Amino acid sequence: MEERDRTGRTGQPQHRINQPSTARERANSVDAYGFQRSDDFDYETHEQLMSEYLAVLTRRSIRWAKLLQGRRRVDRNLKVKRYVRKGVPNEHRPLVWMVCSGAQEQMDRNPGYYQSLLDTHHEPKLEESIRTDLHRTFPDNIYFRKSAEPCLQQALYNVLVAYGHHNKAVGYCQGMNFIAGYLILVSKDEETSFWLMEALLSRILPDYYTPAMLGLKTDQEVLGELVRLKAPAVWKLMQDQGVMWTLVVSRWFICLFIDVLPVETVLRIWDCLFYEGSKILFRVALTLIRHHQQEIAEAQNLPDVCERFKRITRGAFVEDCHTFMQKIFQEPGSLSMATVSKLRESCRARIIADES
């Protein structure tokens, strides 16, 4: 009979399974969307945030499933708007984005159109511009590497070349590759990505990507006017230092916060962008600036201003996407579409006058 010690255990050696002792060891070095995490990624904070956010995701998933009930339609009402603001589960994003943006209606009206664009003769200049940017698009994402099976670079090329033929006034410009890449990662479907891109570039954000980029320039100036009203200390700093808004926020707008904010935070912003329109971009930008206005206002020179604008897009404030999304509807205060439209009108006129 085996001898036991005073605790009741036998004298046999204990075989222990080595359990990961740190958050870094417990977590994957690649996130849910295929992006390689950086060397300085804060695994401890991420683990803490995800332990809370996973519970939120589970609740949202149950409520969305009950709301949709297997239907391929999404109503426009206060309840759905509230649901969208609280986050669309990833499994429902393609459907919700397509329906809410009007992209589904456009696709249904034009069966076979996407394939016809791929079958047409491709303009050499368009092809060359797109191919040049393919390897620069998300090199840190395992699904866009040439070794991936399938490699999403081909899907990305198809969507971009199709859009270039569809909208010849725009063709292709840098920034569009990142937007198309995110759409492909979420929808996992080329044609869906094409129609979502058409909704974004043609209707939600008109003139952002045309050669003159008048819409983009206008909205950067509109942000400046909103900062003057809602974060005057930052506006004064920008005036005193002679810093143009395009220098610090152009990437926010042209890439729709891709590679600026964390992936899940960007997708939560896009949930609202597809449902509520471009006004959401101003809410995000104003929240980042207002929340950090004291830090920004202490900048001493131009490089310091630029560095502080980079710094405010990192850290726990933006990593906690659920709390951040609540903040964007609180921190900037009232922001009506009528106000945005009026500011756009005056800023656009000023830009045209300055450039003529």
From Swiss-Prot:
Name of the protein this chain belongs to: Growth hormone-regulated TBC protein 1-A
Record domain Rab-GAP TBC: where: 87-277
Domain of life: Eukaryota
Organism, as annotated: Danio rerio
PANTHER family (UniProt xref): GROWTH HORMONE-REGULATED TBC PROTEIN 1, RAB GTPASE-ACTIVATING PROTEIN 1-LIKE
Signal sequence, start to end: none
Chain intervals with Polar residues compositional bias: 9-22
GO molecular function terms listed in the Swiss-Prot or TrEMBL record: GTPase activator activity
